[in-house]
Structure formats: structure tokens, C-alpha cells
């Protein structure tokens, strides 16, 4: 590393809210946007069923975040679902409200009744689905259904996204044929759905790049599942390949292994790739906790971005550095998304962490007292007891009592 680069990085670390690898590419991604499907695909997680009020609250919070589009549901599923979608559509949100529809007029009619701004109409295109899901229908037959659905929805003034289900297992020449036909029928956006999460970042980039070269004006959207933990990076590589829109769910909930996590995608683009999405980032933690509560799906404590332990530090070596400059062991400052860091005490704690806690408590100490408390903290944690603030207070009081007796 050159001396100039070292000086530049020192300047950045001292004057920035983030510190990332200087070799990260700066992506020229203009006019990209997110369409969130927590209320539809997220609710398809086995065991999840949001109430009407819960869906409304989540929609409001997504809108507060600043998302361009919210996929509110699948109206044809039930009258209750249709009522919820219609209520969200008439809530007066800034975001456009979309509904999911099969490539069937009755589905689209139901969506129209719900007053939505647009639809995502889908039909499978892979040989696997054509054989086993559609009883050996030909691609041309499927294509005809898709085109009719797009034309019908456009006749009714809707924004239309056409989604090729199982796109990543569809031959590229078939994808081009299907999506060109959808565009010619009036589709505003076409989707690459990685339905089983089987694509790699490189294949997502290739598919999106190839498709973009063959389309005239329709935006490309990517809808990635997380079966191999690739949903977020596949989404990013889709953008690199020319996609403009990304499908997400809060906390990555969804069928099987879930979808691209909204909060992870946003912060990866913002922090690592220096992309300004124009969003209210401080909304993210509250939104994630809300979906955690309403879905009943607990987030791991080490969940990227918003997990309980993401900005927590215990190791003495780490704590010493973090107190001097948090970016030594954090890629970005938690305050950027409305969170705070937490200095924890345990087996690996050193004098600096304990001194930090004592200072917060307003307690004076000398070196001997500090070392005694550190020793006690390690002993109690190794006995299996967590050093909560209350436990630490008890340790301090015990040490003070002993010192006063002497």
C-alpha cells in the first residue's frame, strides 16, 4: 500500500461514518430502485400470516423508509387478502402499490378492483416447469398467455411487470423471446426470477446483461431466493448486469430459505458500493423488529446490519481500539441507522472495557480496584453467568464493600 493511500485512508477513517476496502468498485448505478415483497412473498413463509393491521403498519414503515414500490399481496388468494390490498392501495402512501397476479384475466380483474397502481404478472418458462407444472405445454402457448395478460393489464392503465418464473433455469434464447414479447405487449418491467436460488452472481450478471442488450425500454428486475445464501449478492450482480429494480423482503423472510434481505441489500449498496438510494436509513431497525414480531420469525443475534450483537464488543483488544475509533472494528457507525454500539463484559474483557463501564456509572477507581473488578468479571463469566449491567453493578458493589472493610 502506498504512503499516499495510507494517508488518504487515515483521513477517511477519521472523517467518515464508514471504513471499507479501498478496492471496492464504485458502481455507476443510476435510477435503481427496490420493490419490496414482504407483504406477499414474505408472508408465503410457512407459518406466517399477517393481520390486516400488521400489513398496514409494515406498509407504512416501508413507505417511511422511502421505497418506490410495495408489493402488497396476491388478491385472488382470498377476499380477506383482496380487502387488505385495497386498503393499503387507498392508504395514501407515496409508494406505488403492486399486486401479484397469475397470467389470467380473473387475477388481473381482482387486482383492478383493489385500486392498485400496478401488477406483477407471472408465468413459468423453464423446461422443468413446462413439463411438470403445465403438463407439457409449449413455450409458445405459455408466451401467448403472458402476452395476453400484459396487454389486458395495460389496457386498464396499470404499471405492468412481467415475471418469468424459474427464469434462471430457462434457456437464454427462450428468456429473450419471452421478454421481448412481453416488452412489445407493453410491459414496463421484466423480471428475472431465481425461483430456487440456484444461480450464481456471475450467471445473474450474464442473464441481465444479455437481456438488456435485447430489450429497448423495459426495465429489468431481479427476484432472488436465498437457498445458497446468495440472494443479496445475486441481486447486486443483477444490477451490475443492467437491472434497475430489485425485489426484497424485510429480514429476508420468504419461502424455503427466504429472499434477498432488504436491510442487507440497502446497506451493502450504500456502504460497500457507495450507492445513494435516497432512503431514510434510520427506519431500518424499527422495520426489522416490527417484521420479526409480526412474522414470529426471530432474527439471529448476529443478523447482519440489525442483529443484537452486530455492534457489540467484548474482546479486550477490540474494545481498546473501538473506544479510540469505532471504525477499527466496525465497517460503519451504528448511528447511521439509528443504533448504538454496546461494550459487553465477559471472559475476554480487559481493563479498558471495565474502566469504560465504571465511567458510565460515575464511579471513581484506582488501578488496584480496576484489576480486581476485571478478575471478578472473568471468574463469574467463566462460571456460566452473563455479565449484565445489573451483575456488573453487583460485582462493583462487592469490591467496594471489601475495600471499605479494609
Curated annotation (Swiss-Prot):
Which BP terms from GO are recorded? coenzyme B biosynthetic process
Q: What class of enzyme is it?
A: transferase
User: Which stretches make up the Pyruvate carboxyltransferase domain?
Assistant: 32-285
- Keyword Transferase listed? The answer is yes
Source species, domain of life = Archaea
Q: Does the keyword Transferase apply?
A: yes
Q: GO: which molecular function terms? A: homocitrate synthase activity
- Tell me what reaction this enzyme catalyses: acetyl-CoA + 2-oxoglutarate + H2O = (2R)-homocitrate + CoA + H(+); 2-oxoadipate + acetyl-CoA + H2O = (R)-dihomocitrate + CoA + H(+); 2-oxoheptanedioate + acetyl-CoA + H2O = (R)-trihomocitrate + CoA + H(+)
Q: Could you tell me the EC number(s) of this protein?
A: 2.3.3.14, 2.3.3.-
Involved pathway(s):
Organic acid metabolism; 2-oxosuberate biosynthesis
Q: What are the UniProt keywords, alphabetically? A: Transferase
Q: What else does UniProt say about it?
A: Has been shown to catalyze the formation of trans-homoaconitate. However, probably physiologically functions as an (R)-homocitrate/(R)-dihomocitrate/(R)-trihomocitrate synthase.
Function per UniProt: Catalyzes the condensation of alpha-ketoglutarate and acetyl-CoA to form (R)-homocitrate. Can also catalyze the condensation of alpha-ketoadipate with acetyl-CoA to form (R)-homo(2)citrate, and the condensation of alpha-ketopimelate with acetyl-CoA to form (R)-homo(3)citrate. These reactions are part of the biosynthesis pathway of coenzyme B and biotin.
**Family classification:** Belongs to the alpha-IPM synthase/homocitrate synthase family.
Q: What is this protein called?
A: Homocitrate synthase AksA
Species source reads Methanocaldococcus jannaschii (strain ATCC 43067 / DSM 2661 / JAL-1 / JCM 10045 / NBRC 100440) (Methanococcus jannaschii)
